[in-house]
């Protein structure tokens, strides 16, 4: 053939093919869904391009996909008359995986086949799924608008290389022929192929036709029978659509293997006219944290496909939402640039955001177990919301779940409404603590007085929490208060001190002054506290001072960290504090004070500047 050359697959393709064939074999019929889905995309792209260049239809505007098989040759063919591909397209799309993050995705794969199957499904195997059932795949294609002699031939056994050549192809579009492996004869059975298409492709707008052969007067007459509804699912009446159809449509647009957690299908008429179909997946996509990858909805205008990943209609903290919007108010020649500055877009974004938040609120109310699945998968992303979307901050906060001292479990199941319903009489604030881990938060000495008083504290240990709490300052009229910061309400919780105790504390004034003199400007202040029950000392920060956790975030990001000046608070009732106060030997007094400060800093920060000095001091005092 003219222009024939043999090329090697991109290394990631070889790895993906191997993993896919082994991981997806138990669900091998999905290859037909994937190939028909690709054909549907090709038809959508042709319709869109033909808006500005109708000649691309080449006199054939009836778009469809045709499925046929040859039992003698053991081949199954899927052919469309969509946009087609030129030689460069073929090499780009069939010889490489044009997705950012491919390498990291493949590195996340393990030996757990069930997990691998889900991951590959999320990745969107598309064309490569053909190799699950075929030991050779042949592609003949021509791009719409190109001359017949500009057709392209592609063939591979999926083992490391492929052949590409120039051919003549009269009709535009793509024809994929699968040479089936031994033992895959079920895909040569008319009834079996029909049932798979009905199961997976009934909802797509593109007609799917299957070849019919009849013998008449000694002649074989070939005709084509449409076997799907070929009506865009979102245009149908909700009452006519079964849950199975919604689930399959989700898998079609999201390239996912699992059913979604929930969805919302709405048609809005009035000032703005649009239809939206929004899904919440049951598992996080593999690339959710990849900032380079576009996340967004499919955009249709008057049922004409315009673009994938239209991120303008959903805020970033809802980037896990899948689905589509079909607008009657945008122009057919809309571009991403026009969308960016469009009043229609801003109004749609606002409406769709509220729709998703309402959908999640309903899920939380109706099915706590499903909502817990959602929170485990997407809670960290939703926590970006208070900073990004002040207008919906209360609604977002309502959806959040936390660990707390009430449940004594690391599971994040407590809502802010739950917390407020359990607030003590006279309690005005929502108390929380941020730490590196649940265990560190739970055992923090800052909680001692609150535990004693039976006051619930939210235990925040996700990296994003400290940053989030800078924006989430109140809920339902109740202010949030970090228990590691100085606050009058926390001091008020302490038990009333009787006269004899006051006298004893007064007697400790010279001790406090000695500590201040020793530590100098290493601390902001030294004082006695009644917030502690079991711990001799803690460090706290002023309300306007950078918190310990925020300083850690700055450091982790490589940014300059301003020095945090702590307030050193001593428990006058603790035996170690009393012993230190009674110590007259200046050197030993200094050692005790340094030890108490190191303990407090270690409990607060989880690290010490000089751990060896701390150990030396500890050992020395233990034997003294």
From Swiss-Prot:
Gene Ontology molecular function: ATP binding; ATP hydrolysis activity; ATP-dependent protein folding chaperone; unfolded protein binding
Pfam families associated with the record: HATPase_c_3, HSP90
Chain residue ranges for the region called C: 553-624
Gene3D superfamilies: 3.30.230.80, 3.40.50.11260, Heat shock protein 90, C-terminal domain, Histidine kinase-like ATPase, C-terminal domain
Compartments where found: Cytoplasm
Residue span of region A: 1-336
One annotated Gene Ontology cellular component of this protein: cytoplasm
Region (B): 337-552
Primary localization class, coarse: cytoplasm
Cytoplasm among keywords: yes
Subunit structure: Homodimer.
Recorded family membership: Belongs to the heat shock protein 90 family.
Physiological role: Molecular chaperone. Has ATPase activity.
Protein's recorded name: Chaperone protein HtpG
Organism: Citrobacter koseri (strain ATCC BAA-895 / CDC 4225-83 / SGSC4696)
């Amino acid at each position: 053939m003219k222009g024939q050359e043999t090329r090697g697959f991109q290394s990631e393709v070889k790895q993906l093919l191997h993993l896919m064939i082994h991981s997806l074999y138990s669900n091998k019929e999905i290859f037909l869904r994937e190939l028909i889905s690709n054909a549907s995309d090709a038809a959508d792209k042709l319709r869109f391009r033909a808006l500005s260049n109708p000649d691309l239809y080449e006199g054939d505007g009836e778009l469809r996909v045709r499925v046929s098989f040859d039992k003698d040759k053991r081949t199954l063919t899927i052919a469309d008359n969509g946009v087609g591909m030129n030689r460069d397209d073929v090499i780009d799309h069939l010889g490489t995986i044009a997705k950012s993050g491919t390498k990291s995705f493949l590195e996340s794969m393990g030996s757990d086949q069930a997990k691998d199957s889900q991951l590959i499904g999320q990745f969107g195997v598309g064309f490569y799924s053909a190799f699950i059932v075929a030991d050779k795949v042949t592609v003949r294609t021509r791009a719409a608008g190109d001359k017949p002699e500009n057709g392209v031939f592609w063939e591979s056994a999926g083992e490391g290389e492929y052949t590409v050549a120039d051919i003549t192809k009269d009709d535009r579009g793509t024809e994929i022929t699968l040479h089936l492996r031994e033992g895959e004869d079920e895909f040569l059975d008319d009834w079996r192929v029909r049932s798979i298409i009905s199961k997976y492709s009934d909802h797509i707008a593109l007609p799917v036709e299957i070849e019919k052969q009849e013998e008449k007067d000694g002649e074989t007459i070939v005709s084509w029978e449409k076997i799907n509804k070929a009506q865009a699912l979102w245009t149908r009446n909700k009452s006519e659509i079964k849950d199975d159809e919604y689930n399959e449509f989700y898998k079609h647009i999201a390239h996912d293997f699992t059913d979604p957690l929930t969805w919302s299908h709405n048609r809005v008429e009035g000032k703005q006219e649009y239809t939206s179909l929004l899904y919440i997946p049951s598992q996080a996509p593999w690339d959710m944290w990849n900032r380079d990858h576009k996340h967004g909805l499919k955009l249709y205008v008057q049922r004409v496909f315009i673009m994938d990943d239209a991120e303008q209609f959903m805020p970033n903290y809802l980037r896990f939402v899948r689905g589509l919007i079909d607008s009657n108010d945008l122009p057919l020649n809309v571009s991403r640039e026009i969308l960016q500055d469009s009043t229609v877009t801003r109004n749609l974004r606002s409406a769709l955001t509220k729709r998703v938040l309402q959908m999640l609120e309903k899920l939380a109310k109706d099915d706590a177990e499903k909502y817990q699945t959602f929170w485990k998968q997407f809670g960290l992303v939703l926590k970006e919301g208070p900073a990004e979307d002040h207008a919906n901050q209360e609604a977002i906060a309502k959806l959040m779940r936390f660990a707390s001292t009430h449940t004594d479990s690391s599971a994040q199941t407590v809502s802010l409404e739950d917390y407020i319903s359990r607030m003590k009489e006279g309690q005005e604030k929502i108390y929380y603590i941020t730490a590196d881990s649940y265990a560190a938060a739970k055992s923090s000495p800052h909680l001692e007085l609150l535990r004693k008083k039976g006051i619930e504290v939210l235990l925040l240990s996700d990296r994003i929490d400290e940053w989030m709490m800078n924006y989430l300052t109140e809920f339902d009229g109740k202010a949030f208060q970090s228990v590691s910061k100085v606050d009058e309400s926390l001091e008020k919780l302490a038990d009333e001190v009787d006269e004899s105790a006051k006298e004893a504390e007064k007697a400790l004034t010279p001790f406090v002054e000695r500590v201040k003199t020793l530590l100098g400007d290493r601390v902001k202040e030294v004082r006695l506290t009644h917030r502690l029950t079991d711990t001799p000392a803690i460090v706290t920060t002023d309300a306007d001072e950078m918190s310990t956790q925020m300083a850690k975030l700055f450091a982790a990001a490589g940014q300059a960290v301003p020095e945090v000046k702590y307030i050193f608070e001593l428990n006058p009732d603790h035996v170690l504090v009393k012993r230190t106060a009674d110590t007259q030997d200046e050197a030993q007094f200094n050692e005790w004070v340094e030890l108490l400060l190191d303990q407090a800093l270690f409990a607060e920060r989880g690290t010490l500047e000089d751990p060896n000095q701390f150990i030396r001091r500890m050992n020395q005092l233990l034997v003294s």
